[in-house]
Amino acid sequence: MEITPARGGLNRAHLQCRNLQEFLGGLSPGVLDRLYGHPATCLAVFRELPSLAKNWVMRMLFLEQPLPQAAVALWVKKEFSKAQEESTGLLSGLRIWHTQLLPGGLQGLILNPVFRQNLRIALLGGGKAWSDDTSQLGPDKHARDVPSLDKYAEERWEVVLHFMVGSPSAAVSQDLAQLLSQAGLMKSTEPGEPPCITSAGFQFLLLDTPAQLWYFMLQYLQTAQSRGMDLVEILSFLFQLSFSTLGKDYSVEGMSDSLLNFLQHLREFGLVFQRKRKSRRYYPTRLAINLSSGVSGAGGTVHQPGFIVVETNYRLYAYTESELQIALIALFSEMLYRFPNMVVAQVTRESVQQAIASGITAQQIIHFLRTRAHPVMLKQNPVLPPTITDQIRLWELERDRLRFTEGVLYNQFLSQVDFELLLAHARELGVLVFENSAKRLMVVTPAGHSDVKRFWKRQKHSS
């Protein structure tokens, strides 16, 4: 008899991206208090607060004594009570302020002293320099200007995106490939096989670059401690990078080994340029400096001129030279012809169902075609031919008619008696999923597998 795990089911996770406040709110109080020990962190957090919360922080920034809660409540008109509740909860959740008992028993509010002190330093100047001076290293013989840094950052990040869509020319480190899998953006269908894109990964590719980077860095931070990294150290460094000057070099002197390792990962993502691994200076790119712009806009999609024409005969014409966009189209269509500035593809049942098998949904394919429709297509109402959108949905429904159940397959029984005996036991336990007496095979639930296996071993020993 042979026992085989039977796999099934589609994993179509919806991509959810937390903003900075939600991420910080999920950290422990001890980690938050340590984070506020750096002025760059305090300034970055302050910058992302709602207007009302910013106003409160500025009014209390130079107060050493707590204010009565009733007095703070009077700063806001009654019609803005909802905004007041949200800002109050946010400042408390981020430990920017806390309650303190006043003489006489009244409740008061006071800013977190560590946050208050370091935000003052960030706004007024003073304190320790955020990074070491590069003057001791002398002028950089291989200095990079802003256009070359922009080009480098774009190329490095595109390598990551090309790897996700399966471009053979794109190669990334094992750490990065593992992170993409842990984030649910890619998955391996079989051991040893190269990973392929998931439904969440396809949604990820539809985001704009700042939102992609923010989501990606969130996944990185969630696994940082398992890599032996100090979360506070690398978060503070990220915030520090966002206040860097584009085109200026910075020294790596004084960095810990953990931070130097993090710098190499940022180098691979395109957030910093470092000529060699052992180079003593680095240049933050625009991606690092604008990283926080993905915080509030993490759900945004790409806004670019449309280039796709879809015909009712399922032909697709894409007027683009972008290798990434062509690779994305190839995920759900069959490539027919390729010209210098245009590709022709065919949307087929097989190509769509292959994409669906990877976890990409029909709605995502339709959304991709609609958001990249050529201006000529935009003049139509609806933008995409209904025959195309309906058929893509039908192909998805056709595949989803089957209901998948995980189980363990038992087959290759030596006799019908053995099969009937084990079948009766599985049925008695209520763990039988499927049976075929003619072929002597049965499937049991993963939970019931151990009981059935033990019963079978006992029967073999007793016979």
Curated annotation (Swiss-Prot):
<dbReference type="InterPro" id="IPR004598">
    <property type="entry name" value="TFIIH_p52/Tfb2"/>
</dbReference>
<comment type="subunit">
    <text>Component of the 7-subunit TFIIH core complex composed of XPB/ERCC3, XPD/ERCC2, GTF2H1, GTF2H2, GTF2H3, GTF2H4 and GTF2H5, which is active in NER. The core complex associates with the 3-subunit CDK-activating kinase (CAK) module composed of CCNH/cyclin H, CDK7 and MNAT1 to form the 10-subunit holoenzyme (holo-TFIIH) active in transcription.</text>
</comment>
<dbReference type="Pfam" id="PF18307">
    <property type="entry name" value="Tfb2_C"/>
</dbReference>
<dbReference type="GO" id="GO:0005669">
    <property type="term" value="C:transcription factor TFIID complex"/>
</dbReference>
<dbReference type="GO" id="GO:0001671">
    <property type="term" value="F:ATPase activator activity"/>
</dbReference>
<dbReference type="InterPro" id="IPR040662">
    <property type="entry name" value="Tfb2_C"/>
</dbReference>
<keyword id="KW-0805">Transcription regulation</keyword>
<dbReference type="GO" id="GO:0000438">
    <property type="term" value="C:core TFIIH complex portion of holo TFIIH complex"/>
</dbReference>
<keyword id="KW-0227">DNA damage</keyword>
<keyword id="KW-0234">DNA repair</keyword>
<keyword id="KW-0804">Transcription</keyword>
<dbReference type="GO" id="GO:0016251">
    <property type="term" value="F:RNA polymerase II general transcription initiation factor activity"/>
</dbReference>
<dbReference type="GO" id="GO:0006366">
    <property type="term" value="P:transcription by RNA polymerase II"/>
</dbReference>
<dbReference type="GO" id="GO:0006289">
    <property type="term" value="P:nucleotide-excision repair"/>
</dbReference>
<dbReference type="GO" id="GO:0005634">
    <property type="term" value="C:nucleus"/>
</dbReference>
<protein>
    <recommendedName>
        <fullName>General transcription factor IIH subunit 4</fullName>
    </recommendedName>
</protein>
<keyword id="KW-0539">Nucleus</keyword>
<dbReference type="GO" id="GO:0005675">
    <property type="term" value="C:transcription factor TFIIH holo complex"/>
</dbReference>
<comment type="similarity">
    <text>Belongs to the TFB2 family.</text>
</comment>
<dbReference type="Pfam" id="PF03849">
    <property type="entry name" value="Tfb2"/>
</dbReference>
<dbReference type="GO" id="GO:0016607">
    <property type="term" value="C:nuclear speck"/>
</dbReference>
<comment type="function">
    <text>Component of the general transcription and DNA repair factor IIH (TFIIH) core complex, which is involved in general and transcription-coupled nucleotide excision repair (NER) of damaged DNA and, when complexed to CAK, in RNA transcription by RNA polymerase II. In NER, TFIIH acts by opening DNA around the lesion to allow the excision of the damaged oligonucleotide and its replacement by a new DNA fragment. In transcription, TFIIH has an essential role in transcription initiation.</text>
</comment>
